[in-house]
């Protein structure tokens, strides 16, 4: 089965929904596909409030922001196909292959493509890391915030970036005991506003430490604890500093890597940008890649905050609509300048400045 559309947006997270809404505002025909059973992406896991300025949704919870964007896309007539995987890209003009509900295939022939496929959690290999009970922080967040399922009784979190800190606090909100946070660096890695919450809650902080081993329970059905140790200035474990921490869940929060599978299939040029999570598609200020008509936005173009993903989605949506002749150059420039003003504000400070430089 074949389908023609003006703009295909792959991914219905913060970036993808924003791109779709922005393009549809100018009259573009937009199809959004997502492998999940509802749109919103990571926003529906985020029960915490955004902070910063009102322009950047300060005081709004991610879950509420996701709901608002769904209402907007419905009003604009954006078509959304859920439970749908984009699994193939054919540069010879045959289109983008989609698996629809796992039962039938569909080839979409879009004039423009916006890839907003997000990022995946990084694994951390150590003895016992494949045991039940060693869980990614994102999976923990999904269980407690989306499905309302307790992940365990006592959690040890490995990694103190924003994800590790936020999920730790959300575990406490869910009534789950936290055994501590383990961080190899000499200080916590995330924003002070998140670090302050876990400090005030009395969570033990093992900075300058690493996990050595997950200790299995008697029948190997899970974990009963972890062995951690101090590290030297080369991040190597210091013999004799090992200690046992009792827990039945070990959360892994050691960063994210952009999902570049589809850009790779499309033969988009990739560049190494460690501050953005590894290889990312090269793109210009319109979020257009080295392949004309293919745009990227959000974490798939470099890992940042959800607020940045929203703004990048807007840029891609405006640019795609302009390329289709839905918006004149002057109006498009004004709209993009407003978005860039917002993005530049987000990419300031000790964390944002590094991402700003990497994007440049």
Q: Locations of the language-model features?
A:
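Residues forming the flavin
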Residues: 1-360
């Amino acid at each position: 089965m074949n389908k023609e559309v003006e703009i295909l947006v792959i991914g219905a997270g913060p970036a993808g929904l924003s791109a779709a809404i922005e393009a549809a505002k100018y009259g573009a025909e937009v199809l959004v596909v997502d492998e999940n059973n509802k749109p919103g992406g990571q926003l529906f896991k985020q029960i915490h409030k955004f902070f910063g300025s009102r322009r950047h949704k300060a005081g709004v919870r991610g879950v509420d922001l996701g709901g608002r964007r769904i209402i907007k896309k419905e009003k604009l007539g954006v078509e959304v196909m859920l439970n749908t995987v984009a699994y193939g890209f054919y540069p010879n003009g045959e289109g983008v292959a989609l698996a629809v509900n796992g039962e039938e295939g569909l080839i979409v022939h879009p004039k423009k493509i916006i890839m907003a496929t997000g990022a995946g959690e990084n694994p951390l290999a150590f003895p016992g890391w494949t045991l039940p009970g060693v869980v990614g922080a994102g999976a923990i967040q999904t269980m407690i915030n989306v499905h309302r399922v307790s992940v365990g009784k006592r959690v040890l979190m490995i990694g103190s970036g924003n994800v590790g800190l936020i999920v730790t606090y959300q575990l406490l909100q869910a009534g789950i005991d936290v055994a501590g946070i383990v961080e190899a660096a000499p200080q916590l890695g995330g924003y002070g506003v998140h670090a302050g919450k876990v400090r005030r809650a009395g969570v033990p902080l093992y900075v300058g430490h690493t996990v050595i081993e997950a200790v299995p329970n008697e029948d190997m059905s899970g974990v009963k604890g972890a062995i951690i140790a101090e590290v030297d200035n080369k991040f190597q474990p210091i013999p004799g500093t090992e200690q046992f921490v009792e827990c039945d869940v070990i959360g892994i929060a050691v960063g994210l890597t952009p999902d570049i599978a589809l850009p790779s299939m499309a033969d988009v040029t990739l560049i190494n940008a460690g501050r953005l999570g590894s290889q990312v598609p090269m793109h210009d200020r319109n979020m257009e890649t080295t392949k004309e008509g293919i745009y990227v936005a959000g974490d798939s173009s470099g890992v940042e905050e959800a607020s940045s993903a929203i703004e990048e989605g807007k840029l891609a949506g405006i640019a795609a609509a302009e390329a289709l002749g839905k918006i004149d150059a002057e109006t498009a420039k004004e709209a993009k300048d407003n978005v860039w003003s917002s993005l530049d504000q987000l990419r300031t400070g000790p964390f944002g400045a590094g991402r700003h430089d990497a994007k440049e």
